[in-house]
């Protein structure tokens, strides 16, 4: 049986109609399905547990990276098959699999393909599929939340990026890779990346792979103010790792300590 996890009011209530289309498509396959509606933060995880308890072995998530992250955290090591239907602003996880932007086309592509196993990261007990980030991307997400009351999601994000670029300050952190000695870093961004992109296509970890058993740890050190305007195009093209703005280390375990640290787990902010 398929369980369909959906926030019925997301996308101007389009998600609810999409969930019905998906259940109709599942019925055409001769399979049963049940819709599980979410209501707020953390509810996607609860509804996923309910779906598993109801006997669902295939889980469809309609949502953005944050909702997908919540659902995936409950599916690790369960043996359930996970279908992602992109319905957020950035949809970076769906982008990593080159899924079509059209939600139904993305679902059809997964039905036609074979399941693959991927890695799942854990940060202070919280799961993530794509990235755990600190620094610039956290500041952008915080500003985006402020602007959402005025602008729709994608426009709010673009305006937030431009706003933060002009005033962002680097932060201090102590970083240890795979149990090694701590190094003190003055950072613009630290990304512990399982996937390649954030923010709807900024390629912060252009060589990361979802199934290689490693994180790509991307450290962008303090950038001189005159070079800050280069950050955005460098991230979009993945050039920051090639022109000396960043260093990349592959690792299985990362420890980072910073005063008042907030991390971005697949689009959701967590104070650690």
Where are these regions (language model features)?
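Short beta-strand/turn micro-motifs composed of small residues
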Residues: 6-8, 63, 221, 258
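Gly/Ser/Thr-rich active-site loops/lids in small-molecule metabolic enzymes
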Residues: 148-156, 200, 206-227
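ATP/NTP phosphate-donor binding region
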Residues: 1-59, 69, 105
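ATP/nucleoside-binding phosphotransfer catalytic cores, i.e., glycine-rich phosphate-binding loops
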Residues: 15, 177-179, 184, 209, ...
